[in-house]
Amino acid sequence: MRRLFTSESVTEGHPDKICDQISDAILDEILKKDPYARVACETAVTTGLVLVMGEITTQCYVDIPKVVRKVVEEIGYTRAKFGFDADTCAVITSIDEQSPDIALGVDKALEAKRGELSDSEIEAIGAGDQGLMFGFACDETEELMPMPIMLAHKLARRLAEVRKNGTLSYLRPDGKTQVTVEYEDDKPVRVDSVVVSAQHAPEIDHDTIERDIIEHVIKPIIPENMIDDKTKIFVNPTGRFVIGGPQGDSGLTGRKIIVDTYGGYARHGGGAFSGKDPTKVDRSASYAARYVAKNIVAAGLAKKCEVQLAYAIGVATPLEIGIDTFGTGKISDEKISEIVKQVFDLRPAAIIRDLDLRRPIYRQVAAYGHFGRHDLDLPWEKTDKVDILKKLAGI
């Protein structure tokens, strides 16, 4: 059976991604000085303005406007004619402390209050909120990620690369990519279409941009054996993309959650990642779920695996650890679920401990995806549980 599947990505200069990077840069700066800080930092951008808001509980001081300007400058918004300039944009902050009602549940988990967990067993942290999270892995790519989102991310990163290294110096920071992959019997066989929208200087004509993007962005990224004479390529299909970034659209933290994860190929619990410290299970449990799913696929227990976790606020033990291998498992999903419970401790404190999440590691994943990042040394991408999983599964 043949089918098509599409995923998109955006560059670091996309308005929503600017916000994600600012929120995570502030989080990193705080975690450098206070690893136990509570941070829920949201950012909004529009023409000439950055608004940083949220709840932060910490003993340290961080110069938020300085962090904001540094991020905006590194992305490449350094001229007023771009409609957004690191030196001249206004930065407004509105920060409160975390609600003491939430802290009550997170600081000491419900089980610890009832005496069900000893402090020597684990530093008992209850989940910072209720919610459901998904993790996913499949054997379509070496990163154990779906092919459409990986190609879309690589195209978006390549757009930024050729802009910054001067290969295509007329490009500006905003941009989007989209890849449609054709599957036959659940295996990717060809790329059906590629869409690249790249912000550019006004004096460059469309034909030049199209030729350059195909030559310097698309050809180096899309494998030759995945393209044929029926593959459709669209470069700036409106013909012009001069006004972009926060001048073209306002941006908000947490509005690119599908780009951040699996490109729509797997389910999503709805919670965003950026700007949240690791006591927020929206973030930490999603990373843990990916860690579990990736190890299951890497161990050969399944070709495809989706892990669902669910939590109650203030309760450490997950309410659910669900496994779905979509019929690709070497053993039953129920058996895999039992093995997962033996191998992985999915209480929030254990996730934070085992994945070492109280570190300033978040700005680097705030653009181009949180998963499948072979360019980074991310703890949730390690496959260090493969041997024990194989042993317990008997394969």
Curated annotation (Swiss-Prot):
Enzyme class: transferase
Principal cellular location given in the protein's record: cytoplasm
Function: Catalyzes the formation of S-adenosylmethionine (AdoMet) from methionine and ATP. The overall synthetic reaction is composed of two sequential steps, AdoMet formation and the subsequent tripolyphosphate hydrolysis which occurs prior to release of AdoMet from the enzyme.
Record PANTHER family: S-ADENOSYLMETHIONINE SYNTHETASE
Cofactors that this protein relies on: Mg(2+); K(+)
Binding-site residues, L-methionine: 55, 98, 249, 280
Organism lineage string: Bacteria, Bacillati, Bacillota, Clostridia, Thermoanaerobacterales
SUPFAM superfamilies from the UniProt entry: S-adenosylmethionine synthetase
Molecular function per GO: ATP binding; magnesium ion binding; methionine adenosyltransferase activity
Binding site for K(+): 42
Keywords associated with the record: ATP-binding, Cytoplasm, Magnesium, Metal-binding, Nucleotide-binding, One-carbon metabolism, Potassium, Transferase
Protein name: S-adenosylmethionine synthase
One GO BP annotation of this record: one-carbon metabolic process
Subcellular location: Cytoplasm
Residues making up the signal peptide according to the UniProt record: none
Gene: metK
